[in-house]
């Protein structure tokens, strides 16, 4: 593997290409530059490069099929390249991109875009380089809910970003989030469920704990609690396919079936439950309804693969039709019924596979399709029969989605022994241990990162998942990653993050190159240098020195800083002293609990813009630990089925996952630029937050800092990008 040169002047290529050779010189886009294709079959992909360069850099490059006039040549090469691979050569005379297939050409285009530099004269340049590249894993995926209607454009930007880092699979959970012509009552019941869940004591989590067992999560964030038209969903699917994605609709079967059972209680395994999460697998009406829904989903997605769900089955063999059947019989019959339906339509099947598993986790407990029972605090009895023996009763060409890989390093070998291929679900690339060993399994095809939240940029980023998208994309693509490279990989993701944020938000930030008129410092002279290059700063007395503004809840006076300038943005370098507990959005967090205070931007005309400061979004604690740990923890890394009886602890092992020392790290890397500084001889972390001024034509007179919490907020620096 050629080591990349990662200095201030070299573009960051991420994921890291397999082979890179930097050369001297550069290619400059001029007035006569053209994009040419070897054959018209490559024309639609070449248009992608043309459109991206125009969108990102405002430069139009003509496209033609006359190879003799080429400056940028795009085509296919059938020999010498691996699947999805490409060869890219850049010299002073031009660029040549050849892909092993259409996907390879698309990924080569993403690398071209990462190489691009717009210089101070406005010319678009590309450093000379030779690259041979291909992915390590064939499945590099993401699991998302259908977005809310108001988030569709942002959802497309998210897809665009995932293509930029060479992800190739989107699993989109459909549920009640797409209109159904045959069954509009499903959409109506879905909207009602989502509204009722918000009003329920404890919200959706309250519903989950309302019965004798821990019910399936409701996924009420799907579709924003509503649904999209078929045309809107089709537009999203077509957009993703145009960027090279396999788009897999997830049509939940058996479990997580609220979208079906709330509209048709007659098919619920427990129709007396006010919120039934599981359908009856012995009722013929179940499949008539499911197949009607699936027909409409297939019509819109036109998929090669469909995910049928089946995770977290916790209500089985309870109703009169099912109670005399074994667990493996019920599970296998349901899987096979859905499998045969899709196979007849030429569609392959993916499923969450844990109910076909039987293993002991690192914490000594049995997991998967084992027998489960318990009595709740009200004395109610609940049981689920064992189902794991169904693994011998279902087709071997079902692709297993394995989210129990974080409980044991043997789950993939168990599936391999039974003849199944799989990929990891709920993957966190930055946290998995021994990826180099586990990824070498012959039956492991890759992984997907899950979101389980509103499909919008803010929520996904706050849950640290944008960071996980990037890190996971890197190690799924590159062949040589191992645990010793974690810190370097994190550093590359941090360096890439500003460009990713601009892509997702559709706007430029001054700190990442979007400012041409320089900066002006209003507090701490070297604020910008510290943020950009990590320059050391020393404060001998944090609370009393002239270099820091400390505003606290016990001070009577607000802190004012003179600006007296027209600015495009204001950049705050700040931090707090105490950490706050991280709660992910799927636990339905109240963000007002994280409100620390804010800034008032005062304009010359007397108007004021308020900037709220939320912990984990705009700033974090100074004593941030940017590391991870691996060891025995009292809690499993993720929510798993609650086991009793024979699930008593029998042995312990080191978890196959690391845990972050700082649970806010991914969020803060996205929303701010973390800055390491020396304060009183100790390394501390400050956070640069850039606020975009909605009224750049109005002069900013001053900035006033205000506290509203019991936290002490420290403002170390303030700068502005001049208009």
Spans of features found by a protein language model:
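Charged, glycine/proline-rich intrinsically disordered loops and linkers
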Residues: 183-223, 362-389, 640-670
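N-terminal/edge-of-domain interface segments
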Residues: 501-723
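Contiguous, structured surface segment used for ligand recognition
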Residues: 1-138, 146, 603
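A structural signal for short, well-ordered beta-strand segments and their strand-loop junctions
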Residues: 98, 169-173, 248-250, 307-309, ...
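Substrate-binding groove of N-acetylhexosamine-processing glycoside hydrolases
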Residues: 6-16, 20-22, 29, 43, ...
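An acidic- and aromatic-residue-enriched active-site/binding cleft used to recognize and process polar
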Residues: 147, 167, 174-177, 185, ...
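Feature activates predominantly on carbohydrate-active enzymes
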Residues: 40, 79-345, 350
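Flexible loop/turn segments at secondary-structure boundaries
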Residues: 43-44, 149-151, 177-181, 254-260, ...
């Amino acid at each position: 593997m050629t080591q990349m040169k990662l200095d201030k002047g070299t573009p960051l290529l991420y994921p890291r290409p397999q082979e890179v050779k930097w050369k001297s010189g550069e290619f400059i886009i001029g007035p006569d530059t053209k994009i040419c294709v070897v054959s018209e079959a490559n024309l639609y992909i070449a248009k992608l490069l043309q459109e991206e360069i125009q969108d990102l850099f405002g430069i139009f490059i003509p496209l033609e099929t006359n190879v003799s006039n080429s400056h940028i040549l795009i085509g296919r090469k059938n020999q010498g390249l691996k699947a999805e691979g490409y060869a890219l050569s850049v010299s002073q005379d031009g660029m040549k991109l050849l892909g092993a297939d259409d996907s390879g050409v698309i990924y080569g285009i993403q690398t071209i875009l990462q190489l691009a530099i717009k210089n101070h004269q406005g010319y678009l340049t590309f450093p000379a380089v030779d690259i041979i590249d291909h992915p390590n894993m064939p499945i590099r995926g993401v699991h998302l809910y259908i977005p809310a209607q108001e988030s569709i454009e942002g959802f497309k930007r998210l897809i665009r970003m995932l293509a930029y880092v060479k992800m190739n699979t989107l699993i989109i959970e459909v549920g009640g989030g797409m209109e159904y012509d045959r069954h509009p009552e499903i959409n109506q019941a879905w909207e009602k469920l989502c509204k009722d869940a918000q009003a329920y004591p404890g919200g959706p989590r309250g519903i989950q704990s309302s019965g004798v067992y821990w019910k399936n999560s409701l996924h009420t964030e799907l579709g924003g609690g509503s649904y999209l038209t078929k045309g809107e969903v089709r537009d999203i699917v077509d957009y993703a396919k145009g960027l090279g994605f396999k788009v897999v609709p997830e049509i939940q079967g058996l479990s997580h079936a609220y979208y079906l059972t709330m509209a048709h209680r007659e098919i619920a395994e427990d129709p007396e439950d006010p919120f039934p999460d599981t359908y009856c697998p012995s009722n013929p009406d179940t499949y008539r309804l499911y197949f009607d829904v699936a027909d409409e989903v297939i019509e819109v997605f036109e998929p090669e693969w469909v995910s049928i769900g089946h995770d977290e089955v916790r209500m089985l063999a309870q109703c009169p039709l099912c109670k005399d059947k074994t667990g493996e019989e019920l599970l296998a019959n349901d899987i096979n019924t859905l499998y045969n339906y899709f196979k007849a339509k030429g569609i392959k099947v993916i499923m969450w596979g844990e109910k076909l598993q039987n293993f002991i986790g690192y914490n000594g407990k049995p997991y998967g399709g084992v027998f489960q029972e318990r009595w709740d605090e009200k004395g109610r009895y609940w049981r689920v029969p064992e189902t794991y023996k169904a693994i011998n009763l279902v087709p071997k060409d079902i692709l297993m989605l394995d989210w129990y890989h974080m409980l044991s390093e043997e789950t993939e070998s168990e599936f391999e022994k039974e003849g199944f291929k799989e990929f990891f679900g709920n993957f966190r690339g930055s946290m998995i241990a021994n990826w180099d060993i586990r990824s070498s399994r012959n039956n492991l095809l890759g992984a997907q990162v899950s979101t389980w939240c509103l499909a919008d940029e803010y929520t996904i980023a706050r849950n640290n998942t944008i960071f996980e998208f990037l890190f996971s994309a890197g190690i799924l693509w590159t062949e040589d990653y191992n645990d010793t490279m974690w810190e370097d990989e994190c550093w590359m993701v941090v360096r890439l993050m500003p460009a990713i944020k601009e892509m997702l938000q559709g706007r430029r930030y001054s700190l990442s190159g979007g400012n041409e008129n320089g900066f002006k410092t209003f507090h701490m002279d070297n604020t910008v240098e510290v943020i950009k290059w990590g320059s050391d700063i020393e404060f001998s007395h944090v609370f009393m020195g002239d270099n820091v503004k400390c505003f606290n809840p016990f001070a009577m006076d607000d802190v004012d800083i003179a600006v007296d300038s027209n600015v495009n943005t204001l950049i705050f370098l700040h931090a707090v002293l105490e950490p706050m507990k991280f709660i992910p959005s799927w636990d339905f967090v109240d963000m007002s609990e994280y409100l620390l205070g804010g800034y008032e931007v005062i304009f010359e005309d007397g108007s004021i813009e308020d900037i709220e400061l939320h912990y984990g979004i705009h700033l974090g604690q100074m004593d941030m630990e940017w590391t991870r740990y691996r060891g025995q923890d009292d809690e499993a890394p993720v929510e798993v089925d609650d086991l009793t009886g024979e699930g008593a602890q029998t042995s312990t092992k080191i978890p196959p996952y690391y845990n972050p020392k700082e649970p806010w790290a991914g969020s803060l890397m996205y929303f701010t630029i973390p800055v390491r500084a020396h304060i009183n001889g100790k390394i501390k972390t400050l956070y640069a937050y850039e606020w975009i001024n909605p009224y750049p034509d109005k002069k900013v007179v001053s900035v006033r800092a205000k506290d509203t919490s019991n936290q002490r907020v420290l403002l170390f620096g303030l700068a502005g990008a001049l208009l």
